[in-house]
Amino acid sequence: MPAISVTDLSVGYKNSPVVSGINLQLNTGRIICLLGPNGAGKTTLMKTLLGRIQPVSGHIRYDQTDISEMSAAIDHPSHFPYLSGKQNVQVVAAFWGLDVDPESALDSVDIVRAAHGRKAKDYSTGMKERLELCLALLSRPKFLFLDEPQNGLDPDGMISLSATLRRYRDEGNCVVISTHLLHEIQGVPDECVVVRNGNALHIPDLNGVNLADLYHRR
């Protein structure tokens, strides 16, 4: 089974750790949430897992997977603002050599057909987030990393996002999301990593766990 295993990991910049003592395993068929306040190190941890940043210390092991099976929506925006939603999909698909139907790809993240031909710069904040998700999903990665994907989404958008992530998980993939908005992700992840005050606490099973109590106690 594809997996990413982390042992005694410290992440940061220029050998200065931001978060230390990280131990967890990312398995396919799971949604994992990195939960913590802004600036806690969630994005730094994501970038380290993706191989974009060298760890300060510790080990990351990639089992039955490689960088081509990982995708991310981090450092927004990654889309082209002066291209339409449909053109964005076509350009990214062509770059990666993917055979993708742009209309179906945009439909899958609930971008309405009337917006497919509009320039991305004219999309609402929530619709831009959906486009970012669409582009990250094009390669059908085994490990999908999403940084604050709920930003700008209204309640209907959150319902749509949750359904999309669960469906992708149920296809046998791993989804890692980061957020600082506790109430908006309740019921979405299967497990959680609370990142706070330079530490990371992995909760592998959320059944019976009150995330609010745990989060505010750290």
Outline where the language-model segments fall.
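Conserved ABC transporter NBD signature motif
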Residues: 51, 55-68, 202
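H-loop (His-switch) and adjacent beta-strand-loop-beta switch element
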Residues: 192-205
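Catalytic Walker B motif of ABC-type/P-loop ATPase nucleotide-binding domains
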Residues: 144-148
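Conserved ABC ATPase "signature" region
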Residues: 90, 100-115
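The feature captures the beta-strand-to-loop junction immediately N-terminal to the Walker
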Residues: 35-37
